[in-house]
Amino acid sequence: MDAVRAIASLGGVGFLRPAPGTWGSLAVMPLALLPPWVALLAAFLFTGLGYWALTRLPETGADPGWVVIDEAAGQSLALAAATGWLGVLLAFALFRLFDITKPGPVGWADRRQGPFGVMADDVIAGAMAAAVLLLLALVGVR
């Protein structure tokens, strides 16, 4: 496996079946054990590396199922807002829900072509999950 495919597949995680996107999300869950700023930094790194890798793949017009660095970026962003184990579980569940159902802006981004669309729908899904978690924290759910 070349370096670009290794990055895009998150070290081969994207080739796990079934549900490679879920495996990509699960792969970054250990970030929940670290301070939130680490997950936020990871989200930025995954986003940048993912965009870079996607511009170098021949399949840049599509969103191949084995490309899961986008899930890593979005899930990391959601985890940055998680507090406690309930928050971590909600971060995972909300991110996967928004990534799969593609509501509103997630669906808009998903319809964009190329590396931007591949990365943006997951980053937006992660931001939406983080926003829900922050709102829940404001009302005392942690």
PLM regions: where:
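Interhelical loop and helix-boundary elements at the membrane-water interface
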Residues: 1-26, 52-79, 96-128
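Hydrophobic, membrane-facing alpha-helical anchors
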Residues: 1-4, 39-49
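Short, aromatic-rich membrane-interface segments at the entry and exit
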Residues: 20, 36-43, 85-89
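Interfacial segments of multi-pass membrane proteins
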Residues: 26-38, 76-82, 133
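Short, conserved beta-strand edge motifs with alternating hydrophobic and charged residues
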Residues: 28, 42-46, 68-69
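Alpha-helical transmembrane segments of multi-pass membrane proteins
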Residues: 32, 43-52, 79-80, 91-100, ...
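Juxtamembrane boundary at the C-terminal end of a transmembrane helix
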Residues: 133-142
